[in-house]
Amino acid sequence: MIKLIVGLGNPGAEYEATRHNAGFWLVDQLARMGGTTLRVEGRFHGLAGRARLWDQDIWLLKPSTFMNRSGLAVVSLARFYKILPDEIVVAHDEMDLPPGAAKLKRGGGAGGHNGLKDIAAHLTTQEFWRLRLGVGHPRNLPGGAGAGREDVVNFVLKPPRKEEQQAIDEAIDRSIDPLGLLARGDAERAMAQLHTVAR
């Protein structure tokens, strides 16, 4: 069962269209589907709303704390509503997957993602679900061999190219039904459905 879906990103118009905000894009789509408007919730350090999705009430959250402090928002809402770590899905950009790929997994390391790292620290566990939305890696760009840390930061804080954006949008669309299966407690089918079409 899933009770909270968190999208990771950075607040502010200047970050809205950047690769790092792929998690926000997914949550925005779910809010539209659930006919809800996310509102500023100071006690939860973000934009939050309850949506009716897959015949269940599910909280949606977009932290407004900037990426590396996302855990504060997640733990605040989860504690208030007594939501357990394994009832949480965190949607985030994933550089180890190409644009158009999406994968679900529970637990595991942060893979260098500061948002995931902070959430694990605040929840004191890594046993929450992650929806990894592929955005690609700068080393795969022309002349991108041996991309350093600065290249990575610049890459995630820039908008994807048009064809990449289209692929990411398609991956988000394709993630909706598997998320519904996961929300209803069928994790195996959720992963099988999403991963059989993952590129």
Swiss-Prot record:
GO cellular component: cytoplasm
Main location group: cytoplasm
Alphabetized CDD domains for the sequence: PTH
Gene Ontology terms describing biological process: protein quality control for misfolded or incompletely synthesized proteins; rescue of stalled ribosome
Name by which UniProt lists this protein: Peptidyl-tRNA hydrolase
Subunit structure as annotated in this protein's UniProt entry: Monomer.
Keywords on record: Cytoplasm, Hydrolase, RNA-binding, tRNA-binding
Enzyme Commission identifier(s): 3.1.1.29
Matches recorded under InterPro entries: Pept_tRNA_hydro, Pept_tRNA_hydro_CS, Pept_tRNA_hydro_sf
PANTHER family on file: PEPTIDYL-TRNA HYDROLASE
Pfam families reported for this sequence: Pept_tRNA_hydro
Molecular functions per Gene Ontology: peptidyl-tRNA hydrolase activity; tRNA binding
Site positions for Stabilizes the basic form of H active site to accept a proton: D93
Active site residues according to the UniProt entry: H20
Protein origin, superkingdom: Bacteria
